[in-house]
Regions:
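Intrinsically disordered, low-structural-confidence terminal and linker regions
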Residues: 1-85
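Cofactor-pocket helix-loop regions in the catalytic cores of large enzyme subunits
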Residues: 20-50, 138-371
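Metallocofactor- and cofactor-centric catalytic cores in central/energy metabolism, strongly enriched
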Residues: 78-171, 285, 363, 369-370
């Protein structure tokens, strides 16, 4: 068992009730016990990822030509990278400053210079460019059209472009028209307006990158819990006694979540990571929008459970078996919100805890410490 596990493992010893195991909630003040060290943002440690301060300096340099406009977009605009209802430097989900590297990286989408129309004259040359190279060409400021057989794109007026698109939709009809939205930096507001416009035109088929990104999770959630969406909110994280991250690395993939995890840690929440590898960003993290965390860092992981790749299901079965045998299952909740409990309990009763732990790549003691 990794060293971070001692705090949680000791707190939930044999026979401890849920109430006894619950961490004490604290006021969200600065807490030295969570500090990583006295290096602002871990400068010089060589293990910090992502390095927000370096990214901020790089992005500021990229926008040196029009800093005033870039500042207006940040201070008055919405976030292109999340759905927290961001208005300027604040959002509707959590107090404090809202600023993440995802939003900064997408800033260039909103502040790009107009591209040179001459660069659109050769479609074959455009095909040879990468996505990054195409974005570097700049912002498409005017409608461009390429007809079949033409070498490249040529500029047309807004009236001609809108009339041609409208005529195509009118001739096809709403039943034979689909709207697909996917682009780097499309905001919630754009999705909302596009959906309203599609309905006004009688178009029922609206799809977006959200479905492509989350299709696997929606299928799995529907099969597992009967609902295709998550059953908790970010607000729930702030009030949770224990947050379990299974096969997830939010420090790299969902950095906005780390601010909520930091606030939860200040309130006494424990964090367990179930993953073969303990990501550096889950050992220690520096939240750039929080003075305390930016200066001293925040210890995130309290317990690391190094399951074998593919051993997640066996691990969860083993944990559930321990909870059942120790009478730590909230049967009132289970009875009100689940189906098939009796069959699951009977199946677990016939399984050997040591075999389950072995399949998960763990010792029985590690499973018991987590449970």
């Amino acid at each position: 068992m990794d060293a971070p596990g001692d705090a949680v493992g000791d707190a939930v010893g044999d026979g401890a009730s849920r109430a006894e195991a619950r961490p004490a909630r604290r006021g969200r003040r600065w807490n030295r016990s969570l500090w990583v060290g006295l290096r602002p943002y871990g400068i010089g440690s060589g293990t910090v990822k992502p390095n927000h301060f370096k990214d901020m300096a790089r992005i500021a340099w990229q926008h040196r030509r029009h800093p005033v406009y870039a500042w207006r977009v940040l201070s008055r605009g919405v976030c292109d990278g999340c759905a927290l209802g961001v208005a300027g430097f604040h959002d509707w989900t959590i107090d404090g400053v809202h600023l993440c590297t995802t939003r900064l990286e997408l800033l260039s989408v909103n502040t790009a210079d107009e591209l040179d129309p001459a660069g659109m004259a050769d479609a074959a040359a455009l095909r040879s460019r990468t996505n990054r190279e195409l974005r570097a060409l700049g912002r498409l400021a005017h409608p461009m059209r390429r007809r079949a057989g033409e070498r490249g794109f040529s500029r047309v007026s807004w009236d001609d472009a809108l009339a041609e698109v409208a005529d195509g939709i009118r001739r096809a009809g709403g039943e034979r028209t689909a709207l697909y939205l996917t682009s780097r930096g499309i905001t919630n507001e754009v999705y909302y307006v596009a959906g309203k416009a599609a309905r006004a035109m009688g178009v029922a088929s609206v799809d977006s990158a959200a479905r492509v990104c989350h299709a696997p999770s929606t299928v799995a959630l529907r099969e597992a819990i009967g609902a295709a969406a998550t059953t908790c909110s970010l607000q729930d994280v702030l009030e949770a006694d224990l947050v379990v991250l299974i096969g997830s690395n939010p420090a790299n993939n969902q950095p906005v979540f780390m601010k909520h995890l930091y606030e939860a840690k200040r309130g006494g929440t424990k964090v367990a990571v179930v993953n073969p590898y303990l990501e550096p960003g889950l050992v220690a993290y520096w939240v750039p929008s929080s003075p305390e965390s930016a200066l001293f860092g925040t210890k995130i992981c309290d317990l690391h459970v190094p399951v074998r790749p593919g051993g997640d299901v066996a691990f969860l079965h083993a944990v559930l078996k321990v909870l059942v045998e120790r009478d730590l299952v909230d049967m009132d909740f289970v009875g009100a919100h689940t189906a098939g409990w009796e069959e699951l309990a009977a199946d677990l009763a016939g399984r050997d805890l040591a075999d389950l732990a072995r399949t998960a790549g763990l010792a029985v003691a590690e499973v018991e410490a987590f449970a």
